[in-house]
């Protein structure tokens, strides 16, 4: 979502609370829970899953391996659920021509650096840069080059923008900030 006036441009950034992350976390949780239940059923010799007889899988080595995969999957699933609940990567980009300041804010993982807040002067922005990598995994990323600071990505790498969309976004931002556009 973007909010824009004559002097201020605020762009909200979606973090890890995306439908695809919810789907992957749920699928991974259910699959790993199934693996763990099958491994536990083979160890106990009791049927914990009604549609799967435990006698078909012996505990050593199949039951151990399935239990290991189930536990590993639960750890990965809990990591995904934590990133979703903390909304890692969300935030905003604020460009204020009136004050001459650019503020970039992102939420990180809990701890000392939970809040990532970068502040720059607009006069320190050298250019808006588009980096394009074509191929099977095409990638188009919009960067802001800051004098003495390097490049700061403004779009996520998984944000699959078409060439027209990324060009339009770069042109609007460069026009708003009154800086040149570079394409790599």
UniProtKB/Swiss-Prot annotation:
<keyword id="KW-1133">Transmembrane helix</keyword>
<dbReference type="GO" id="GO:0009522">
    <property type="term" value="C:photosystem I"/>
</dbReference>
<protein>
    <recommendedName>
        <fullName>Photosystem I assembly protein Ycf4</fullName>
    </recommendedName>
</protein>
<comment type="similarity">
    <text>Belongs to the Ycf4 family.</text>
</comment>
<keyword id="KW-0150">Chloroplast</keyword>
<dbReference type="GO" id="GO:0009535">
    <property type="term" value="C:chloroplast thylakoid membrane"/>
</dbReference>
<dbReference type="GO" id="GO:0015979">
    <property type="term" value="P:photosynthesis"/>
</dbReference>
<keyword id="KW-0793">Thylakoid</keyword>
<dbReference type="InterPro" id="IPR003359">
    <property type="entry name" value="PSI_Ycf4_assembly"/>
</dbReference>
<feature type="transmembrane region" description="Helical">
    <location>
        <begin position="19"/>
        <end position="39"/>
    </location>
</feature>
<comment type="function">
    <text>Seems to be required for the assembly of the photosystem I complex.</text>
</comment>
<feature type="transmembrane region" description="Helical">
    <location>
        <begin position="57"/>
        <end position="77"/>
    </location>
</feature>
<dbReference type="Pfam" id="PF02392">
    <property type="entry name" value="Ycf4"/>
</dbReference>
<keyword id="KW-0602">Photosynthesis</keyword>
<keyword id="KW-0812">Transmembrane</keyword>
<keyword id="KW-0934">Plastid</keyword>
<keyword id="KW-0472">Membrane</keyword>
């Amino acid at each position: 979502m973007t909010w824009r006036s004559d002097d201020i441009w605020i762009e909200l950034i979606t973090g890890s609370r995306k439908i695809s992350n919810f789907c992957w976390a749920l699928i991974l949780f259910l699959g790993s829970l199934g693996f763990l239940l099958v491994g536990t059923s083979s160890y106990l010799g009791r049927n914990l899953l009604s549609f799967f007889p435990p006698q078909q899988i012996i505990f050593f080595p199949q039951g151990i391996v399935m239990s290991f995969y189930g536990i590993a999957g639960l750890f990965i699933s809990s990591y995904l659920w934590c990133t979703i609940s903390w909304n890692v990567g969300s935030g905003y980009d604020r460009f204020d021509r009136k004050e001459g300041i650019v503020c970039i804010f992102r939420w990180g993982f809990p701890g000392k650096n939970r809040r990532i807040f970068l502040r720059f002067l607009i006069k320190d922005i050298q250019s808006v840069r588009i980096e394009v990598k074509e191929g099977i995994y095409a990638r188009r990323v919009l960067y802001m080059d800051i004098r003495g600071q390097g490049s700061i990505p403004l779009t996520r790498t998984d944000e699959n923008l078409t060439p027209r969309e990324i060009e339009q976004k770069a042109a609007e931002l460069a026009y708003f900030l009154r800086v040149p556009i570079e394409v790599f």
